């Protein structure tokens, strides 16, 4: 919950109870500010600056690997489950080399080759090819991490069963996996890959969020901490890897003309939930390895 929301609740509680022992804080602005500043800093301490929060995909000589985006066809899919290296969905074939580039970076991880070789490695692909109008963002705006919060049976392990929102009840808020991600210096394990064919469209922040239930909103939002975080704008046609606890944001089109953007994201690590109202089913019948939630995640 944001500090400003806590302040509103505090003042409302004081109004309901004129004899509240903390009523003195309403008139003592310095003490009031001191308390909430301390709360803010305590929450901010869970956002740890880490160079391993994201990285560019690079060649052996250290140069960034450039991505050759295919001719656009208007694809618009979100978190579609695919068998990495195996699925043969015709309209995704032009993106095969980009997908393969990401997967091969993971094959040094223990157990990855076996999953890949046996066709048991499920990833989640997002491709959006669309016009972005001036002042608009193509993807989700606002500073956030991919890992949301959930309750009940959603954590710590998925039960691979379709459930409704009642699964959220009767438990504390906890972080849900949305790709996880670890960096070992020479290779990545799990995580998320992202690229775009336009400049100034996404910003990544070199931090990892710990104890996200103390910091983010239920959708991973971090907007209230923006003033204390600095980031890097992604370069176009360049693949980036990051974790589901890495802050990032989609940026608006700041030109005076519409731009046609191709956005690519591949989640190669485990996820805890898959939202049927927001995500794209696989036409070949591949199922997500996660709890399937049939309700709107924003309700």
Residues of each region from the PLM?
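N-terminal auxiliary "cap/dimerization" subdomain that precedes the catalytic jelly-roll/cupin core
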Residues: 1-120
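Exposed regions on extracellular, virion, or secretory-pathway luminal proteins
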Residues: 2, 19, 135-140, 230, ...
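A generic structural signal for short, non-catalytic loop/turn and secondary-structure boundary residues
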Residues: 1, 17, 120, 136, ...
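Catalytic core of non-heme Fe(II) oxygenases with the double-stranded beta-helix
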Residues: 136-235, 274-277
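Short His-Asn-centered micro-motif
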Residues: 128, 143, 195-197, 242-245, ...
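Catalytic core of Fe(II)/2-oxoglutarate
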Residues: 220-299
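Intrinsically disordered, low-complexity cationic segments
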Residues: 19, 28, 143, 218, ...
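Hydrophobic alpha-helical segments and helix pairs
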Residues: 91-170
């Amino acid at each position: 919950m944001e500090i400003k929301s806590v302040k509103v609740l505090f003042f409302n509680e004081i109004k309901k109870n004129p004899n509240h022992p903390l009523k003195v804080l309403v008139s003592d602005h310095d003490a009031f500010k001191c308390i909430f500043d301390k709360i803010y800093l305590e929450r901010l301490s869970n956002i740890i600056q880490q160079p391993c929060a994201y990285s560019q995909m690079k060649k052996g000589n250290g140069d960034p690997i450039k991505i050759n985006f295919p001719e656009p066809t208007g694809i618009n899919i979100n978190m579609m489950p695919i068998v990495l290296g195996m699925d043969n969905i015709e309209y995704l074939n032009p993106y095969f080399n980009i997908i393969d580039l990401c997967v091969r970076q993971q094959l040094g991880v223990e157990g990855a080759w076996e999953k890949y070789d046996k066709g048991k490695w499920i990833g989640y692909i997002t491709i959006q090819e669309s016009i972005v109008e001036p002042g608009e963002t193509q993807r989700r705006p606002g500073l956030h991490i991919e890992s949301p919060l959930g309750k009940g049976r959603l954590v710590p392990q998925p039960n691979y069963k379709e459930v409704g929102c009642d699964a959220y009840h009767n438990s504390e808020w906890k972080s849900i996996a949305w790709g996880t991600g670890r960096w070992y210096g020479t290779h990545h394990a799990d995580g998320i890959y992202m690229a775009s064919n336009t400049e100034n469209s996404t910003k990544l922040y070199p931090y990892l969020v710990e104890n996200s239930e103390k910091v983010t909103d239920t959708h991973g939002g971090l907007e209230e901490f923006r003033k204390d975080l600095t980031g890097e704008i992604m370069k176009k046609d360049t693949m980036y890897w990051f974790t589901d606890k890495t802050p990032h944001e989609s940026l608006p089109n700041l030109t005076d003309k519409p731009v046609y953007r191709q956005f690519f994201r591949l989640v190669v690590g485990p996820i805890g939930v898959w939202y049927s109202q927001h995500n794209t089913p696989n036409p070949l019948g591949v199922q997500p390895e996660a709890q399937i939630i049939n309700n709107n995640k924003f309700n």
